[in-house]
Every structure is written in structure tokens, then in C-alpha cells.
Amino acid sequence: MLSPRRTKFRKQQRGRMRGMAYRGSTINFGDYALQATEPCWITSRQIEAARRAMTRYIKRGGKIWIRIFPDKPVTMRPAETRMGSGKGSPEYWVAVVKPGRIMFELDGVSEPIAREAMRLAAQKLPIKTKFITKAEEYI
């Protein structure tokens, strides 16, 4: 699973997910892409599950690019702990995804195969997504 090798600080504030994604919202590597239509935190486990689903479906052909990286730590307190005594310890990592963000790109396969692979990947993610092609993007 994906996680940063080292970070400047162990813990982060939660922040807010307002507005659209302007960076990372165009297809740069492949011919087909999966685009987020809602804001969400996507965990490294969800990214890995989606990647596996796509890889298993396209088998040997094609190349996959993961365009999001989980660089935000999410902290949790132990169960049945009283309030106070500081922030919890980091438990897992998330990628902050805004609407319009390209999450996965795919190349080297036909459009029906790419569409089905992206559909399988989208089922593993907690948000609504959209399948887009490079041809559609520049109309």
C-alpha cells in the first residue's frame, strides 16, 4: 500500500475540501481516465483495491497510472479512551480528492476493456466517478 517514506510532521489537521480540482484534472499519460465527481478522502487501501481490480481485468496488456497519492495521515484514538490527553496516533494515510481530479489513467487497451476496468475500479472507491477519454477532453 502507498504511504510517504518520511514526512516533515507526524500529524496534520483535517482541513476542508472546498471547490473543484484545477491541478491534476487533465489526462496527461494514458488515453482513458477515471475522474472524481465528488470530494472525498480516499485511503491507501482503497487505491490498492482499485488498482488490483483494474490490473486483474486487463491482464498483461495496457499500462496503469495512479494519479493520486495518500500523503495525509489520519489519526485515531484507542477505543474506550477518555477525552483529552492529546491527539491520537496516525493510523492510516489518505489522498484528498476534489471533484474533477483524475485518479487513474489507462493506455494500451481498447475502449470497451478500459471502460470495464475503470468500472471495476470505481466499485472499490467510496465516490461517484466518471470515465473520460483523451478525445472527449479536448472537444
UniProtKB/Swiss-Prot annotation:
Keywords, alphabetical: Ribonucleoprotein, Ribosomal protein, RNA-binding, rRNA-binding, tRNA-binding
Keyword Ribosomal protein (UniProt): yes
Any one GO cellular component localisation term in the record: cytosolic large ribosomal subunit
Pfam families per the UniProt record, alphabetical: Ribosomal_L16
SUPFAM superfamilies, A to Z: Ribosomal protein L16p/L10e (SSF54686)
One of the protein's GO biological processes: translation
Domain of life: Bacteria
SS bonds (residue pairs): none
Stored CDD domains: Ribosomal_L16_L10e (cd01433)
Transmembrane domains' residue ranges: none
GO MF, any single term: tRNA binding
Quaternary structure and interacting proteins, as annotated: Part of the 50S ribosomal subunit.
UniProt record similarity statement: Belongs to the universal ribosomal protein uL16 family.
Record's function text: Binds 23S rRNA and is also seen to make contacts with the A and possibly P site tRNAs.
Protein name: Large ribosomal subunit protein uL16
Record organism: Rippkaea orientalis (strain PCC 8801 / RF-1)
Source species taxonomy: Bacteria, Bacillati, Cyanobacteriota, Cyanophyceae, Oscillatoriophycideae
Gene field: rplP
